[in-house]
């Protein structure tokens, strides 16, 4: 895992974003299974990305102790590989904070653009990424393990 010791404080006292560690793997695996299972077997894939030295990953911590979400960025290609927030905390700014954190790290590493894939039928994710400045640049059929089409989105940073 590419280590970055940068932490960000959240808007609420006790909230912060920190680099993911091996101790976060059970949380990441469980959340991946919960939110990505409609697309395929991501509960093993996402933890693999977190341990990959070509990736940077982070976890949002609430009240100083409870993980609420995570994000993984591939440094090699500038792609957000995964971003997820526990369902009860979605639409509270956690996803946006995680995305901004990765944009900051990407800029520090000299990246000029971020890419991501999101399911064609996932209108909530498309709206979230659109609000963050991402634009659809294409699509990829059968992108997900269960065969769904993904929209490819990018953002200059």
Predicted regions, residues:
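Acetyl-CoA-dependent GNAT
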Residues: 10, 15, 19-88, 99-101, ...
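Conserved acetyl-CoA-binding loop-helix of GNAT-fold acetyltransferases
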Residues: 91-104, 127-131
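Active-site acidic-Proline motif in GNAT/NAT acetyltransferases
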Residues: 86-88, 92, 120-123
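Terminal substrate-recognition subdomain of acyl/acetyltransferases
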Residues: 1-10, 147-157
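Conserved catalytic-core motifs of GNAT/GCN5-like acyltransferases
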Residues: 115-118, 130, 135-151
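Short glycine/proline-centered loop/turn elements that form peptide/ligand docking sites
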Residues: 99, 122-125, 142-147
């Amino acid at each position: 895992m590419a280590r970055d010791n940068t932490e960000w404080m959240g808007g609420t006292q006790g909230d912060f974003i920190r680099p993911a560690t091996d101790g976060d793997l059970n949380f990441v695996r469980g959340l991946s299974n919960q939110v990505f299972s409609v697309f395929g077997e991501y509960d093993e894939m996402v933890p693999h990305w977190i341990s990959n030295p070509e990736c940077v990953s982070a976890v949002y911590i609430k009240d100083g102790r409870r993980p609420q979400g995570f994000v993984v960025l591939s440094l090699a290609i500038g792609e957000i590989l995964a971003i997820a927030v526990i369902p009860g905390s979605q639409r509270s700014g956690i996803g946006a904070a995680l995305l901004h954190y990765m944009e900051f790290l990407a800029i520090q590493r000299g990246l000029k653009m971020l890419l991501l894939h999101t399911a064609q039928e996932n209108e909530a994710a498309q709206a979230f990424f659109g609000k963050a400045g991402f634009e659809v640049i294409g699509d990829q059929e059968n992108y997900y393990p269960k065969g769904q089409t993904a929209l490819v989105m990018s953002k200059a940073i």
